[in-house]
Amino acid sequence: MAEQRGNMLMKKYEMGKLLGQGTFAKVYHARNTETSESVAIKMIDKEKVLKGGLMDQIKREISVMKLVRHPNIVQLYEVMATKTKIYFVLEHVKGGELFNKVQRGRLKEDAARKYFQQLICAVDFCHSRGVYHRDLKPENLLLDENSNLKVSDFGLSALADCKRQDGLLHTTCGTPAYVAPEVINRRGYDGAKADIWSCGVILFVLLAGYLPFHDKNLMDMYKKIGKAEFKCPSWFNTDVRRLLLRILDPNPSTRISMDKIMENPWFRKGLDAKLLRYNLQPKDAIPVDMSTDFDSFNSAPTLEKKPSNLNAFDIISLSTGLDLSGMFEESDKKESKFTSTSTASTIISKIEDIAKGLRLKLTKKDGGLLKMEGSKPGRKGVMGIDAEIFEVTPNFHLVELKKTNGDTLEYRKVLNQEMRPALKDIVWAWQGEQPKQQQQPTC
């Protein structure tokens, strides 16, 4: 068996100490015995990934990682697999998080500019290859032994965990302090423009030593982000203020582009020309060890389809009483959400019974999506309803009901007069309403 034997993995990597772990993966320090190079190995539990419905996403993301070879991006060296595990062999970045520096005090302007230049060049490189990060945050900004910035988790977001450290700049798990207004809004967004916003928040933090959008009241902080309400400290010079106003523009259509940022005089001061000249075409593809059961990515026994896992921001955005879209635009009233302490199988069974009673054709899709369709056309065609189940914890789920076709009034009538009463036994709370009991769900 090619899997880990003792301290050796694939007869090539000497495994070291555990560096961290999350829901799907553990990360170990390791040494390549052929080159003596220090690496990090992310060991992923294939069964958990399959149950979470994330295998296709991981395979797509492995392919995109071939496109993102850049000196300021944590490198994926190799992908291997066995019948039970997937292994990502990654560059080991030894300098820790950039924000550990900021916790000791704000950075001088030249130092902040250097890191911002490296960040922008790395992110722009990925954008040029059609890859967007969408989750730039403190944990993803690392430093190597030469104090150069390294952006991590490009292309590996499916395995990102929401666990964060407490501290000056690490906000509560899921707090969208670095997230663009349009992402909070959940109405679809341009990945490039969302990344630009996050880069602006990071620049502010480097120069100020604190977040631009912060409030003890979470909802007030959401509002500040939505309106881009922030104040620059007195030590910010005019050029930085102007640049930040262009980056932290709540309207993505008028927000500054990467090209314009890179033309900005403040940005270009002292810029290392090698960053701009970096060859965008990688010379080598990432080696994938096909002899170690990579083809068995899909060969595991058939598993019950489980609902999608929500990341922490999704939980906050979708959970009871926190419908954020109303802060930015009028709701079209086509969707409703409720939370439940029932198991996923119980929720699915209940929805199947409701669909049968309403004579709706029900189709199960991957990741906890149930599609229902009427048998007869109504005023605006055949009514279509999606029910999507998200796992917050094994004992707590969020369900989103959404009209996908047909007349809105007809849908609201079916929802309020038929579906809601039938769902009452499994509903903990409908979004915007108080839970039927004050008992908190088990997390």
UniProtKB/Swiss-Prot annotation:
This is CBL-interacting protein kinase 2. One of its GO terms (molecular function) is ATP binding. Residues 302-329 form the NAF domain. Residues 333-362 are annotated as: PPI. Belongs to the protein kinase superfamily. CAMK Ser/Thr protein kinase family. SNF1 subfamily. The keyword Cytoplasm does not apply. Its cofactor is Mn(2+). It comes from the Eukaryota. The gene is CIPK2. Residues 13-267 form the Protein kinase domain. It comes from Oryza sativa subsp. japonica. CIPK serine-threonine protein kinases interact with CBL proteins. Binding of a CBL protein to the regulatory NAF domain of CIPK protein lead to the activation of the kinase in a calcium-dependent manner. PROSITE patterns: NAF, PROTEIN_KINASE_ATP, PROTEIN_KINASE_DOM, PROTEIN_KINASE_ST. Residues 153-182 are annotated as: Activation loop. It catalyses: L-seryl-[protein] + ATP = O-phospho-L-seryl-[protein] + ADP + H(+); L-threonyl-[protein] + ATP = O-phospho-L-threonyl-[protein] + ADP + H(+). The active site is at D135. The activation loop within the kinase domain is the target of phosphorylation/activation by upstream protein kinases. The PPI motif mediates the interaction with the ABI (abscisic acid-insensitive) phosphatases. It is an enzyme of class 2 (transferase).
